[in-house]
Amino acid sequence: MKKISIVGLGYVGLPLSLQFVRCGVDVLGIDIDPAKIEDLSQGRSYIDHISEDEISEAVGKGTLRVTTDFSELSGTEAVLICVPTPIGPHNDPDLSYVLETACKVAPHMPRGMLVTLESTTYPGTTDEELVPILEQGSNMKAGVDFFVAYSPEREDPGNPESKVAQIPKVMGGYTPACLEKAKSLYSKAIKTIVPVSSCRAAEATKLLENIFRSVNIALVNELKQTYDSMGIDIWEVIHAAATKPFGFMAFYPGPGLGGHCIPIDPFYLTWKAKEFGQTTRFIELAGEINTAMPDYVIGRVSLALNSKLKSIKGSKVLLVGLAYKANVDDDRESPGYVLMNKLSDLGATVEYYDPFIPVIRPSREHAHWAGKKSVKWVQEEITDFDLALVATAHDNVDYEQLLSWSACVVDTRNVTNGLDHKECLVSKS
């Protein structure tokens, strides 16, 4: 294949597009957001770790074209769908982006096209939801007239060692022929292909990966609270346990889960499991523990302020780090927003500092924070706060300065470990 389409030019679709371009495949990028199309057309990157020079070169050469028009995909040989799969207000799967994309793709599919879904979802989505829409809209038969596969995305934003080409790619086909077609395409851009027996097996693989993280993070979050009550530093314990060369993998506590995967994906399986009469108590308990962590952190904030004879109400609190993980500009599902909302509801004046997020972008979930700007990292601004709450461990924040400028710091990421804080009350939360 020499020309493909990729639908969804976000944190998954854009890096994947550029990787195929590097490997000599022309890419038509499609996104429903005109602002993204405008940025890419002008060589601008809206993702911090994606090079503008590489975008400009690809767009200039015509190896990457971008559009909002789905009809243009008819001139390509494959469509890779990389759209969001959020959850609803009751933790039920929201497949609307996937299904709407399928409806827009189907009428323009030429015979022999490969359609691959990369969005995380429950087992059965590709076979039971995607294929019927594609067949009805194209008037063709999957596995006969066109090919279908599922290959879950694996991205690690902010990790400079994580390269798209080097991350093994799991994939399953609707039929054996579909799998071979998908392997043929992805092997052009990805070093290692991991075939599995079906789309359902590939979908289940992705959920296992993310549930594994969710459950283990919940474990250390629970242990943190238990060890805190005993006066034991969980971070010291984890670092000591990590010296065991077998049978242990280190996970770390935090103020809550963030990102578009770990807080959401486990609930896709819990929802689907009910169809088969199965309960997923362990997975759901992990979700409860992780979801409750912001409340625990707020309690620690309250105790820290009380030690200074202050209450949350009327205090000025600075959230240090709004991105969901270190060294990225991605604030999707960030626990920082939960913390800001709770502190604000309790009567605190809340500001934030994040070198990766100078201004909060508009979103449906946090519309009331849109347009709010990060404070400046200068002493006269930082010292004005009653408490600083570290929620994200960005490497380019000077935590020694934070300790010297602040009277009180609640540290959820262990960034103050080993630093001098004689003049500052530090609470590890």
PLM region spans:
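Structural/interface elements that position substrates and couple domains in central-metabolism enzymes
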Residues: 1-429
